[in-house]
Amino acid sequence: SGYNNGTDTGSSGGDGKGRVWILNVKTGAVIRELNTNVGSATDPSGLAHLSAFSQRGDVDATVEAVYGGDLLGNVWRFDLSGNTTSSWFIAKVAELKTTGGSAQPITTEPELGVVQNK
């Protein structure tokens, strides 16, 4: 599911909701699916162009969070910092709209950085 929710003959279309799948690198097994629950088949979220964040890059490069935007103007944080997969969560960190209320699509990956170790 995502931006292209078109269907081919004999296949079902996506639901248009933004999702991130965390996979086992060796086996390809799904460790966890994180679903924004935003979007629909007729108005897909188009979540794409994700950026991974690690404040511990000099130690072990463990990803602590993933950020991404969607075509509905939302910026998301997929927090992977918890010790168990059940503690991982999603937070909407911004919703970009015009003064008239129209969504401003996010079409590039977020640029991430640390400001004074915060």
Where in this protein do the model-derived segments appear?
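A fold-level detector for beta-propeller and closely related beta-sheet-rich head/sensor domains
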Residues: 1-118
